[in-house]
Amino acid sequence: MNAEHSPFRHYLDLADARLGSQVVAVSDEWFAPASRMLQAGEPVWKEGVFDDSGKWMDGWETRRKRFEGHDQAVIRLGVPGVLKGVDIDTRFFTGNHPPAASLDGCFCAEGDPDDSTSWSEVLAAVGLQGDSHHYHPIDDERPWTHLRLNIYPDGGIARLRLYGVPYRDWSNQPPGTALDLAAAVNGGRALACSDQHFGRMGNLLNPGRAINMGDGWETGRRRTPGHDWVIVALGHPGSIEAAVVDTLHFKGNYPESCSIQAAFVEGGNEARIEAQSLFWRELLPAQKLEMHQEHRFERHLNALGPITHVRLNIFPDGGVSRLRLFGRPQLP
């Protein structure tokens, strides 16, 4: 199963350091710090680069174990979530990768786990190969705040991706509070798009403003009639009161204009949603865009009531760094 065809690749990487995820405990990180496993970028190889500990590696690497036991790292998720799948990535680790790994999880209402914390198995021990992705689906609806990666007995991991859905107790949401319902940290997901040649669609929903052009969604130059689009599932149904389309960092490659369609979708799969999106109602009529600028739309929005999905259309192509949809959740 490769990266592009793994079904849980469309979920949020809950271990992404950009969400605030961090390593809070580690048994050993002699050769390379465990925090590198959580970096959003792809691992790289630096030929001939060494530091005081040895060969520089883009990931977490422990020393060779000369006694019983195994190494482990505890990750506090930036946002609690339900896992849908994992990728234990050993790229560039050859001859120094662990033969096996497993995952445990826990839910801490406050703080970090301690010696009295009860851990549950999330992924039983699986075999690992060097310089490879290792994709494993997770069929477990329990939310976690912390994950513990166990490697047997030692070695290096380039990246740990923990794909899932952010967990939020919407019943405790104060009535009338407006939230960014498209935000990844609130459960928003990019489902499909016409093109993502230069920047992945999921970047639109990342926290904060984009750090550079690569941290947004950007399509290839369109050489045929039509326009580009992306479909986003909101984290929770709600009525949208303001939309923000941010073209930060996009200057000679921003869209000329954009529009937003929306619908309340019940049931169906992603293929059906994509096919029907062309006929969704208009939430935001076509609006002119400017380069490197945050555009906020309020009075231009049509009152559609509660919705679950939106389709952002950009004309004809280009890049958008962030999409924000502020609204009031539809609570029971």
UniProtKB/Swiss-Prot annotation:
EC number of the protein: 3.5.3.4
MF terms in GO: allantoicase activity
Any matching Pfam family: Allantoicase
Enzyme class: hydrolase
Catalyses which reaction(s): allantoate + H2O = (S)-ureidoglycolate + urea
Protein's pathway: Nitrogen metabolism; (S)-allantoin degradation; (S)-ureidoglycolate from allantoate (aminidohydrolase route): step 1/1
Gene Ontology biological process terms from the UniProt entry: allantoin catabolic process; purine nucleobase metabolic process
Domain of life (superkingdom): Bacteria
Keywords for the protein's UniProt record, in alphabetical order: Hydrolase, Purine metabolism
DNA-binding recorded as keyword: no
KW Chaperone (keyword) present: no
Family: Belongs to the allantoicase family.
Protein name: Probable allantoicase
The encoding gene: alc
